[in-house]
A protein has these predicted regions:
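Bacterial N-terminal signal peptides
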Residues: 12-24
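N-terminal cap/lid segment of alpha/beta-hydrolase-fold proteins
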Residues: 38-99
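Acidic beta-to-alpha connecting loop that harbors the catalytic carboxylate
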Residues: 66, 243-245, 273-276
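Serine-hydrolase catalytic machinery in alpha/beta-hydrolase-like enzymes
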Residues: 78, 85, 100-173, 329-332
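Primarily recognizes the serine-hydrolase "nucleophile elbow" in alpha/beta-hydrolase
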Residues: 156-234, 246, 251
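Short beta-strand/loop motif that positions the catalytic acidic residue
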Residues: 239-241
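Short alpha-helix in the alpha/beta-hydrolase fold that links the catalytic acid
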Residues: 249-259
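Alpha/beta-hydrolase-fold serine-hydrolase catalytic core, especially in secreted/extracellular enzymes
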Residues: 261-267, 273-376
Length: 376
C-alpha cells in the first residue's frame, strides 16, 4: 500500500483520490502578503494549451559539466569535462529585480524535451507567476550521443544532476528570480535525477558553496538507486506515479522515501491508481515501451561509486553501464498513455506542493538540515 505521510509539513495527502489539501495556505510567516498572488494563481484552474501560444521562452546557456558518475564529478578527478548547458527560460510578466518570482527547473525524460510535457508545463506555470527553466541535457551533449539507447548509455543521471545544479546557480544569479524558492521537477529519467538531488551527497558535489533547491518533484521516476549515505538536504520531495506503471516498484519507492526521511527530508507519495507511465505526455496510448528497469537495483557508495546487483564491476563507463542495465532490466516493457483527467489531478497536487514551498520560509538552513541518519 502506498503510504500517506501525515506529518508532511501542513499538507494532508489522500492516496487513491490523489488530491492534496494544503492547510499551509494559512501560513503567516514574514512576507506572505507579498507572495499571496502565487497562492491565488496556482489555486485557479490551469490555463489550457491553446491559451498559451503567445508565451515564448528565451533560449539560455550557462556553464555545466559532464561527469559520468559522482566519482568523476569530484573537482580533482579530471573526468568532468565542461559543458555549456542548454535551456529555455519562461519568465512571468512583471518579473523584475523589484518583484522577483519563484522558479522551477525542469528535467526531461529519456525521450528528451517534449512540447506536450515540459514546454506546456513551463508555459502554464509562467502564466501563473512562476518562472520555468526547461533543461535540454541531451541537446547540450549531441556530440556524445544521439539515438535513444545511445543517449541512455552515455548521458547519465549524473550529467543531468550537473545541469540541475548549474541551473540553480544560473537562476540565483538573476535579480528577477527569488533564488531561495527554486523547485526541481523531473520526469521519468529526469525524475530519478530530481530525487537524487535531494541527497546531500549529490548536493555537496555539485554545489559545495551551499546552493540548495527548496523542493523536489519526481514524476513517475523509477526508484532503482539506494544511497549508502542517507543524509538529505532537508528540502521536501513528492513522488507522483501511476498505479498501472510497471516501471515503478512501489516497495522500492517506499524504501527510498524512508531513506530520505531518515536523512532529514520530508517525503510524500501520490499514486493515481488508473494511470500508466507518462500520463502527461504526447502518446494517447496505452502503448508498450521496450525494456523495464523496475527490477534493477543500484547502490551508490559513500565515495560515489555505483554498482549493480548482477555485475561485478562498477558503473564507471558506458560498457559497464550497458552490462549492468542489460542484466537487470526485463523485456516485458511497460505501458505509457496520456490521461488528461489524471493530468488535471496531478496539476492540483503539484500546485499545492509549490504553494507550500513558495509560501514557506524558503530553502532550509543547510547546516540544520544535514544530520547523520541512524545506522541501517
Amino acid at each position: 500500500m502506498p503510504r500517506s505521510p501525515g506529518q508532511f509539513g501542513q499538507w494532508v495527502l489522500i492516496v487513491g483520490t490523489a488530491w492534496v489539501l494544503a492547510s499551509a495556505l494559512a501560513w503567516a510567516g514574514p512576507g506572505t502578503a507579498d507572495r499571496g498572488f502565487f497562492r491565488l494563481r496556482l489555486s485557479q484552474p490551469w490555463p489550457q494549451e491553446a491559451a498559451l501560444t503567445d508565451i515564448a521562452g528565451e533560449p539560455v546557456r550557462f556553464p555545466s559539466s559532464s561527469p559520468f558518475s559522482l566519482v568523476d564529478a569530484a573537482a580533482t578527478s579530471g573526468r568532468s569535462p565542461p559543458t555549456l548547458a542548454m535551456a529555455t527560460l519562461f519568465l512571468p510578466r512583471g518579473a523584475s529585480a523589484a518583484a522577483p518570482v519563484p522558479a522551477v527547473v525542469m528535467l526531461h525524460g529519456a525521450s528528451g524535451v517534449q512540447h506536450q510535457r515540459e514546454m506546456t508545463y513551463a508555459r502554464q506555470l509562467s502564466a501563473m507567476g512562476v518562472a520555468a527553466l526547461v533543461i535540454d541535457s541531451f541537446g547540450a551533449r549531441r556530440d556524445m550521443a544521439t539515438g535513444f539507447v545511445d543517449r541512455l548509455l552515455n548521458i547519465t543521471e549524473t550529467m543531468i544532476l550537473a545541469d540541475a545544479y548549474a541551473a540553480l546557480r544560473y537562476l540565483k544569479s538573476r535579480p528577477d528570480i527569488d533564488g531561495s524558492r527554486v523547485v526541481l521537477i523531473g520526469f521519468s529519467y529526469g525524475g530519478m535525477a530530481a530525487t537524487y538531488a535531494a541527497f546531500e551527497q549529490a548536493a555537496e558535489v555539485f554545489a559545495p558553496d551551499g546552493e540548495r533547491f527548496a523542493g523536489h518533484v519526481a514524476f513517475y521516476a523509477p526508484c532503482i538507486a539506494e544511497f549508502e549515505d542517507r543524509r538529505a538536504t532537508g528540502a521536501p520531495l513528492i513522488m507522483l506515479y501511476g498505479g498501472k506503471d510497471a516501471i515503478i516498484d512501489p516497495a522500492r519507492c517506499e524504501a527510498l522515501a524512508r531513506d530520505l526521511e531518515a536523512g532529514g527530508s520530508r517525503v510524500g507519495i501520490i499514486v493515481y491508481p488508473e494511470a500508466f507511465h507518462q500520463w502527461d505526455g504526447r502518446v494517447a496510448g496505452p502503448r508498450k515501451i521496450g525494456r523495464n528497469l523496475a527490477p534493477c537495483r543500484f547502490r551508490v557508495a559513500r565515495d560515489g561509486t555505483v554498482t549493480g546487483s548482477l555485475w561485478p564491476f562498477p558503473m564507471a563507463d558506458a560498457f559497464n553501464r550497458r552490462m549492468i542495465l542489460g542484466l537487470c532490466s526485463d523485456s516485458e516493457g511497460y505501458l505509457i498513455g496520456r490521461d488528461d483527467q489524471v493530468r488535471q489531478r496531478s496539476n492540483a497536487d503539484l500546485a499545492a506542493f509549490l504553494e507550500e514551498v513558495f509560501e514557506g520560509p524558503g530553502v532550509p538552513d543547510a547546516q540544520a538540515a544535514r544530520r547523520t541518519p541512524p545506522p541501517r
